[in-house]
Amino acid sequence: MEKLAAGLAGLRWSMGAFPLDLIVSRCRLPTLACLGPGEYAEGVSERDILLIHSCRQWTTVTAHTLEEGHYVIGPKIDIPLQYPGKFKLLEQARDVREPVRYFSSVEEVASVFPDRIFVMEAITFSVKVVSGEFSEDSEVYNFTLHAGDELTLMGQAEILCAKTTKERSRFTTLLRKLGRAGALAGIGGPGSMGATGGGGGAARPVKSKMPCLICMNHRTNESLSLPFQCQGRFSTRSPLELQMQEGEHTVRAIIERVRLPVNVLVPSRPPRNPYDLHPVREGHCYKLVSIISKTVVLGLALRREGPAPLHFLLLTDTPRFTLPQGLLAGDPRVERLVRDSASYCRERFDPDEYSTAVREAPAELSDDCASPRHARLCLPAPRAPGAVRAPGPPGRLGPALPAPGDSDQDYVSPDWAGVSEPAGGCAEIPYEELWVHQAPESRADARARPLAGPDLISFGIVGPPRHEPEAPPPPVPPKSEAVKEECRLLHAPPVPPRGGGSCSKLTGSPPVLPHFPKLQPVHSPSSSLSYYSSGLQDGAGSRSGSGSPSPDAYSLYCYPCTWGDCKASESSSRPPPGPLPSTTTQPSQASRGLSEPLSGRTPSLLGADTPVVKNYHSCPPLFKSSRPQKSFAPFGALNPFSGPAHPSGAPAASSSGSISTSGVLATSSPTHSPGPGPGPQGQGYSAAPSSSLSSSEWQEPALEPLDPFELGQASPPELELVRCQEPRAAGAPGSGPCLSPLGQPKAFEPEGLVLRQVPASLSPAALQGPEAGGTLLFLTQGCLEGPPGSPREGATGAGVRDASSWQPPADLSALSLEEVSRSLRFIGLSEDVVSFFARERIDGSIFVQLSEDILADDFHLTKLQVKKIMQFIKGWRPKI
């Protein structure tokens, strides 16, 4: 052992780690391996050298221990099918509920109609079946049942059978020959002549309906019809099971002959196995529940006190291991060490005994984590400039940024924060801390040093490691430059120029990082959001593997905005110039936000001649998305109804060249009205290029007093959100080229378009729900039109329609929560249905994807309500 230990200590290990399934498939077993860096396997330390022994198929029977009169269920154990001990069948609970019954015909079985029956003796039956009531075609139907066949009863039916009778009248025979006996005999037409033949005493078929029992034969996996006239012996218990009521039997014999679950007793002292982890003692009772097969890899940890056997489930426990250098190249020194280790373990380890040991079954993930919202999962902090994209339910995605205090801190998804992970030691971090107070210093630390803790679950790193050259992360610039860097990292556009000039002459495009930061799933922070509004009902989603930002990465933050969930971002340096408070669903925050007037802005930053126009941060609709996103906005800047009035301007590019809008933006302020300002030449309208699959939102960080703008990308070219901008002072900090991050910009002339405004007399009561806040905005269906003949005409045209004359649009996928409620009232649904949809946060993008099964089974709507909604989605409108 000393010589072997010295040889093992001198081994040099490979730089990369390989998954266990790859090692088993590529390497000749047995082989040596060592746990990879950052990997975890139960019972294995980083210093252990493993001998991967062999790969085996284990078939085990899952059983529960029975205690106190067979009512208390104890721990769950796995009994191998090769277990040598014997068991005795107990009186089953089903024997008391459903006593064994015997039947002598199919008709008797049909009168009782048990769930299943067993054939006690071989049965053969033949019947002549007619294909139709008005057809002479018939065929003989034969079937044979074997003793022991298990039949599951499915229902009853009737078949048309043909019986032959003797003709007693020659006149009838003559008429039949002439084809005139149809009215007398009930069967007419010349087609019957060939069937009967001529002459007296000929046989003619008579059709009759025969009841039968429809069953499924599990031996042949076919459905068959047993006529009631079929005679034979049947029972509710298998003949093999009845024979096994007496005597002692192995687990394999019980599994092959008895239907599970079944209660068994240990009648005598079982043989001992040194590898047993659960002692099976005489007198113990067990309930055999199910049978399962799994592929395991046997291994031994080579230690000075002796080899310690262990095993890994090949498809679930797949940690990564490093291999000795020279193993794959056939180094004779390494091969000799492998042979010596195998011979050393052969004397001290019996793989057959180890495979037949009784063990306590591991807890299944489905038992502890019935839903992904309660999964006990620890996600590591990012090791690269961006986060790791993790496959999983397409809930909310967001960049996983380190906390200010500790860059090595592991993260717990928000909905999982209530469940502690003892192995990972993850701290419970409130959801808001993931998005606010993001100091650049902590991010720089996270980029500089990798994560020290173990990677409990490896997302997206299956297979050999990729040795691609990665560009080093850029250094953290000063504050103003850090804002631009964070904008780029968070899929945000660069800061627009402060001057009022047109952006159409700028044709550049902002640089894209070589490796764009990927995103990590973050579930809903709000427990009030339901399953349907979270987007978890659809698991399909496209992934982009390129270095450029994925199209569906743009739609991860804003649409459809549940503005009640938005949180205002707090600046870590100096506050923005008079931002409006965020509008949330919490009464305390809402009342605090309404108490701050617009006049509280800094006079030096907001002059009297500057129009106080509330900038609308667009949340573009998501049309025909492959997966509905959950509504949320992590930064306050994404809340259309919170934050200061930002100027925004960007070139507009549309695939069709035409610009339209999904609504008319109407702005009214309770304290201020727009003052005189520059003419239309200083204003512009911006609309992002369209995408047929997803929408894009840009986040603005809260580190710059003069906030960068947000650019929203609408989905189809015929429905885009267009916003109004106000000029910025020339020479303001952050002025730079106005570049479109999504492609080549096109020139856009705004002189021919105008946004209709709401009259100042709009009541705040017109805005209900989370839309009500410090600044009143109202968005209605409409379109951008040319300038009216007079300013009065533009102000009073049709900005806000009366509620009674509201009509739902043809495309329902852009509806807001309030408009979905109005649509349901429009088609005449009751208020309880409307309130249910509002409570479930069903907006247009989710509304158009609802199916009849969801409406009927999950929403518990009546058939009429389901039909109304489905027809309404397909384009039906009631004629009023």
Swiss-Prot record:
Sequence ranges of Low complexity compositional bias: 640-663, 683-696
GO-annotated biological processes: cognition; neuron projection extension; response to stress; social behavior
Domain SAM residue range list: 813-877
Disordered: region residues: 385-407, 461-483, 527-548, 569-611, 633-713
Keyword Translocase: no
Family: Belongs to the GAREM family.
Residues covered by region (CABIT): 12-320
Modification Phosphoserine occurs at: S740
Keywords: Phosphoprotein
Protein name: GRB2-associated and regulator of MAPK protein 2
Domain of life assignment: Eukaryota
PANTHER family, per the entry: GRB2-ASSOCIATED AND REGULATOR OF MAPK PROTEIN 2, GRB2-ASSOCIATED AND REGULATOR OF MAPK PROTEIN FAMILY MEMBER
Function: Probable adapter protein that provides a critical link between cell surface epidermal growth factor receptor and the MAPK/ERK signaling pathway.
Source organism (scientific name): Mus musculus
UniProt keyword Protein biosynthesis, yes or no: no
